[in-house]
Amino acid sequence: MWGCGLAWAQRLKTITVGSSGADFPSIQAAVNAAPETGAVIRIQPGIYREVVHVDKPRIQLRGETKDPSKVVLVYGNSAASTCGTSCSATLFVTGDEFFAGMMTVANDYSKHSDVPSQAVAVKVTGDRAVFRHVRLLGAQDTLYAASEKCMDGRSPCAVKRQYFADCYIEGHVDFIFGDAKAVFDRCEIHSIPHLAGGYLTAQSRSRPEQGSGYVFNGCTLTADPGVENVYLGRPWRDYSTVIYLNTKMGSHIMPAGWSEWKSAPVPRLPTATYAEFHSSGPGANPRTREKWSKQLTAAEARKYETKVFLAGMDGWNPTKVK
């Protein structure tokens, strides 16, 4: 089921991608051929080395597999080789009501270069985006879950809603970052080695009224062997908001949980919203957490449930989008 209750109810055109009897050999060619009303793009197993821009609404990228590692979209740009972090992604999504399922999106810059640089796998600035059973692979700045025009502190601005369910997201420093309003349900957030430890998130809510934030619900925080000194997040902007609900945390998570953005002109932790509810595992240490963070009550946690947090004015419920 796709987009239950949406005003557009017409059947979407289907386009195929692959090397065996498909409509197009590349994903970008299929996106280019899609009508403005949207399309279901079915992708055969294979490795697609390209940069993809999805600038149309209602585009679905669906891997034709039950194993997301068999359909791989990958490229190796970096902040240093392009106009900066925002230009380095393998997949750019600006169109609303995007869907991706059963595929991998990767940025493999770090595998081919010893020069550290931000290198984004996915940059999403569309509203009502859904990712299901998707693997996102990178190192620094893997997933840019953003709202585009809110970062400069202007308000009001249009905060974009994004939903990630049963996904695997890998990286080391700030590898889930930006100012979207996003929920991560039942995802594995995996830390890979970095000399200085790492940070799972760098959420960038600039003003309290903007309403963006990240919620991790029922997730698992894992790491490669030997990885340690990893923080749950640090505040990229003054009102950074990150909530962990019912999340299992490995021993690589620092007891303090949260870190200051050390180059900020003034401390940001006092104005950030960092909280947990029913964390478990060796990385769950409520008594040693940074003093500005909070342990939520059950009543407080309810407002971060997916159907509540992402509802918006249109009552969006992404759990029904399959």
Residue ranges and their predicted role:
Residues M1-G3:
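Sec-dependent N-terminal signal peptides
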Residues Q10-K322:
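Sequence-level preference for short, compositionally simple segments enriched
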Residues G5-A9:
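Sec/Tat signal peptide C-region and signal peptidase I cleavage site
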